[in-house]
């Protein structure tokens, strides 16, 4: 892998650096039109969908939870990559010529790595948050401020990882065209290039997916393998069901990312195994297809949220209410019904003590996509992915639930 969008120096570096021909990869106009339509779908769907996701969360107070702040970061990274890189990737891959100057060459090689890093580690943060909420429900949860700090740290690390590729990017004039390339420091075995590519692949793909896989495996075993006590109230059944729905949704999001990006990483590791592969005439079409699949990962999450989460579905219906084929939705499902909005477990606990009951931390930040507004909002607050917050459960009920869930 020469980088994360576009390919180092040219679509096919082994050819572009060793030939005097202007461009050996020219395809018929009808193919270009088809590919242009396919890439346009990505840009429009991703930008519009992710902007709506950010609006749904940030414009509605009850949607501002720890999990959803990370989803905002994920949506921002994906919308930005779709807007700033997809079209440029497509035109460069089709024409094999760089039209955008030195600055954008550096940005184009720099930003996608940072965006993908921010995306996958936002998913990792959500997995960690779900893990702590379900496996260690008594532990303190992240506050809104701490969540924002984590997001800033993610972006700082993302920019640091992407910096070398942006720094060494440059443009070069070849016979009849200009190409955008990465000039790594000279070394007989290209050791700097290889080490960097391997590190990037591990850090933005394999490592976070392993961490996420472990977290959701443990969470899944806890949620699905445990029996809910028969004498438990409907509230507990609803809370466990809510947790399961959120975990299912995030597993779909992560699996979609993994499937979309796996062929891309394999494609760019193959030159180290079979350098002659890039000499094949069909490789341009293969690259366009693999790149389309990778970039399409930016447009699926809004669709997943809309399909699997009632709150997001209400938000999308409201955002597109002007469309004749969109039925009117109960928009109040996104609004704050209760004036008692608790951001942390500590505040829930303190209020519960004043009410002479003991607050349960189960579900303190859990999302319940299927929950609707309750008749008694003073004792129940619903959050984003449907988080249901029970502010007054007895010690007996809580202990019974914990012992069963953690057994």
From Swiss-Prot:
The record's listing under CDD domains reads: 7tmA_NK1R
Lipid-modified sites (S-palmitoyl cysteine)? 322
Gene Ontology CC annotations of this record:
plasma membrane; sperm head; sperm midpiece
Query: Which cysteine pairs make disulfide bonds?
Result: 105-180
Q: What domain of life does the native source organism fall in? A: Eukaryota
Point out the glycosylated residues in this chain.
14, 18
Q: Where is the composition biased (Polar residues)?
A: 376-407
Q: Is Metal-binding among this UniProt entry's keywords?
A: no
Any coiled-coil regions, as ranges: none
One example of the protein's molecular function in GO is: substance P receptor activity
Family assignment?
Belongs to the G-protein coupled receptor 1 family.
Q: What does this protein do?
A: This is a receptor for the tachykinin neuropeptide substance P. It is probably associated with G proteins that activate a phosphatidylinositol-calcium second messenger system. The rank order of affinity of this receptor to tachykinins is: substance P > substance K > neuromedin-K.
Descriptive protein name? Substance-P receptor
